[in-house]
C-alpha cells in the first residue's frame, strides 16, 4: 500500500508554523486593506490615469483596496490548506513511529 507520507516530522512542523504565521499575517492585511487603511496606499496598484480619467476617483481606489484585500484573504485560505497538509504529515509521521516493520 502506498504511503501518503512525503516529508519528515521537522519539515511538517515547520510547515505548520509558517502556515499559522501566514494565515495571521494575511488575514490582518486583508482586514486592513478592506478597511482602506491609508498607510497601505503604496501597495495599491493604481496609476495616474486611474485618477484623471474618472469623475469619482476615490471609488476606483476603494475598489482596488477591496481587490487587494480579497487577494490577501485568498492567500490566507491557501495557507490554511498548506497547514492542513502539514498537520496530516505530522499525524502520519507519528503513526509511522508506532508501526513495527
Curated annotation (Swiss-Prot):
Kindly list the residue ranges recorded as spanning the membrane: 13-33, 68-88
What EC number(s) has UniProt assigned to this enzyme?
3.1.-.-
One GO molecular function term of this record is:
RNA endonuclease activity
List the GO terms this entry assigns under cellular component, sorted alphabetically.
Answer: membrane
Q: Name one Pfam family in it.
A: V-ATPase_su_f
Against InterPro entries, the record matches this protein to: Ribonucl_Kappa, RNase_K
Q: Which UniProt keywords apply?
A: Endonuclease, Hydrolase, Membrane, Nuclease, Transmembrane, Transmembrane helix
Compartment(s) of residence: Membrane
The role this protein plays is:
Endoribonuclease which preferentially cleaves ApU and ApG phosphodiester bonds.
PANTHER family hit by this protein: RIBONUCLEASE KAPPA (PTHR31733)
Q: Which family does it belong to?
A: Belongs to the RNase K family.
According to UniProt, the name of this protein is Ribonuclease kappa-B
Name the source organism.
Danio rerio (Zebrafish)
Amino acid at each position: 500500500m502506498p504511503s501518503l507520507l512525503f516529508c519528515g516530522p521537522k519539515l511538517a512542523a515547520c510547515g505548520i508554523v509558517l502556515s499559522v504565521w501566514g494565515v495571521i499575517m494575511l488575514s490582518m492585511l486583508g482586514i486592513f486593506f478592506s478597511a482602506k487603511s491609508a498607510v497601505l496606499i503604496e501597495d495599491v496598484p493604481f496609476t495616474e490615469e486611474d485618477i484623471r480619467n474618472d469623475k469619482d476617483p476615490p471609488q476606483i481606489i476603494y475598489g482596488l483596496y477591496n481587490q487587494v484585500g480579497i487577494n490577501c484573504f485568498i492567500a490566507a485560505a491557501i495557507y490554511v490548506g498548506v497547514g492542513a497538509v502539514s498537520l496530516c504529515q505530522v499525524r502520519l509521521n507519528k503513526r509511522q513511529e508506532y508501526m513495527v516493520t
